[in-house]
Amino acid sequence: MQRIMLRAKLHRVTVTQADLNYEGSCGIDQDLLDAADMKEFEKIELYNVNNGERFSTYIIKGERGSGEISLNGAAARRAHLGDQLIICTYAPMTDEEIATYKPKVILVNEKNGIKEIKKV
């Protein structure tokens, strides 16, 4: 049996851009993607801390070092500039994998720069 488990989380990143007319997706600073081992076009779940919205989309690469968290297309309706989001990826795992696995949690500063990388 497999269970769907948290793989990585960007905790309380701040929305820096929103473009309703873009085709869709969430742009994320490449530094954050590398730290969390998230990949372009990977499905993500987003949780808006400010309004409680929960939605999913996919990743596109943002400029390295920019602090970018951009919501595009329909996702742009789910948050305002300055809102804080929790962005998660999940993966199927067996009980044997779960026994030794620890997800990555990336904590950021007010400019979406990496403050701490934890395995929880």
From Swiss-Prot:
Keyword hit for Repeat: no
What is the annotated localization of this protein?
Answer: Cytoplasm
Record's comment on post-translational modification: Is synthesized initially as an inactive proenzyme, which is activated by self-cleavage at a specific serine bond to produce a beta-subunit with a hydroxyl group at its C-terminus and an alpha-subunit with a pyruvoyl group at its N-terminus.
Which keywords accompany this UniProt record? Autocatalytic cleavage, Cytoplasm, Decarboxylase, Lyase, Pantothenate biosynthesis, Pyruvate, Schiff base, Zymogen
Q: Does the keyword Endoplasmic reticulum apply?
A: no
What pathway or pathways are given for this protein in its record? Cofactor biosynthesis; (R)-pantothenate biosynthesis; beta-alanine from L-aspartate: step 1/1
Give the EC number(s) listed in the UniProt record: 4.1.1.11
The chemistry this enzyme catalyses reads: L-aspartate + H(+) = beta-alanine + CO2
> Which residues are involved in binding substrate?
57, 73-75
One molecular function GO term is: aspartate 1-decarboxylase activity
Annotated NCBIfam families: panD
Give the record's family classification: Belongs to the PanD family.
Q: What the protein does?
A: Catalyzes the pyruvoyl-dependent decarboxylation of aspartate to produce beta-alanine.
According to the record's subunit comment, the protein's assembly and interactions are:
Heterooctamer of four alpha and four beta subunits.
Q: What is this protein called?
A: Aspartate 1-decarboxylase
Q: Which gene encodes it?
A: panD
